[in-house]
Structure formats: C-alpha cells, structure tokens
C-alpha cells in the first residue's frame, strides 16, 4: 500500500550514549554541610563562563568553606579537563594539602575523568560529588559565581579575554582580602 502511494516509513534510530574516559563517580561526602572547622578541610569547585566580545572565557575556582576564600582559580578559552587540573595544581602549590581535604564538585565531565581521579589520588585529596541534577549540593561554588557576576562582571562590557582576566583577577584579590564575608 505504501509503495502504491509513494510513502516512506519513518524509522527512528536508536541513540547510543557514548562513554569515554569520564566514569568516576564519588559519594556526596559534603552533604550540604557547608561549614568547616579549619582551613583546607572542605573545598568546593566548579566552572562558570564569562561572556566577552571575543567569546566565552571559562573560570574554574576552588573555594575554602572555612573562610569562603578562593584558594585557587584558573581561566581558559576552553572548558576542559586541563583547566580543572591546573586549578587543583595551583591550590596544591599555594596551600598545604592534607589527606583530610575534601574537594566537592558537581558531576561535570571534568570531575568524572580518569585524569581528575589520578590527580586527586596523587595529592591525597578526597573527592566528593553532588547528586545528579542537584545544584544545591554545590551551592557555595555557584554562590561565588553569582557574587562575582553581580558585583563585577555585569557592570561592564568586556571587550576581550585579556580585560576579563584582569578584572576577574582583581576582583578575586578584592574578594579574598577586602570584601566583608
């Protein structure tokens, strides 16, 4: 019958979920307990994007829950695993990391990668991860980005990457050293 009327059937193809190296999941050890008794006990990390006239600049941060300071940050034009690893390495150079440091993240591909697993293990960092689709589990990392964008980024039109890097670096210095928490 279909041939007689030149009709074609629509065949839906099965969609495959591709699995690459992004396979590590960690328990939610932080469990929304956003207070720490001492520095370098609980850290939260995340990535956000900053819009510039040249394109997006990605900002990766690590925030200490003891005093809400930004322990380390890195920026890049790409949202990559390398950006996250470089941020952790910067934190390692700056702070004394003990085996008790808990680093909490969302379930982004950077944080489930083999490279992230290897680096956190080599530094003695205990990874913790938000539940899937639950941004409140990593609220204090998200909160910093909200503060940054409200107090700094949305007040100016960024002409390019260099200007964004400068403004963000100056703001983080202000945030850590002068802003009342």
Where would I find each of the regions flagged by the language model?
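Charged DNA-binding/catalytic regions of mobile-element recombinases
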Residues: 1-181
């Amino acid at each position: 019958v279909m041939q007689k009327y030149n009709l074609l059937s629509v065949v839906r193809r099965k969609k495959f979920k591709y699995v690459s190296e992004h396979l590590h999941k960690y328990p939610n050890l932080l469990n929304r307990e956003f207070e720490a008794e001492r520095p370098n006990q609980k850290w939260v990390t995340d990535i956000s994007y900053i819009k510039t006239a040249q394109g997006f600049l990605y900002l990766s941060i690590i925030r200490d829950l003891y005093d809400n300071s930004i322990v380390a940050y890195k920026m890049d034009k790409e949202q990559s695993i390398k950006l996250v690893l470089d941020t952790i390495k910067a934190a390692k150079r700056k702070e004394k990391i003990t085996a008790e440091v808990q680093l909490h993240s969302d379930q982004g591909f950077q944080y489930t990668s083999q490279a992230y697993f290897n680096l956190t293990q080599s530094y003695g960092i205990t990874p913790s991860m938000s539940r899937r689709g639950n941004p409140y589990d990593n609220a204090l990392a998200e909160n910093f980005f909200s503060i940054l964008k409200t107090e700094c980024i949305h007040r100016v039109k960024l002409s390019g990457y260099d200007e964004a890097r400068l403004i963000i670096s100056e703001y983080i210095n202000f945030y850590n050293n002068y802003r009342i928490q």
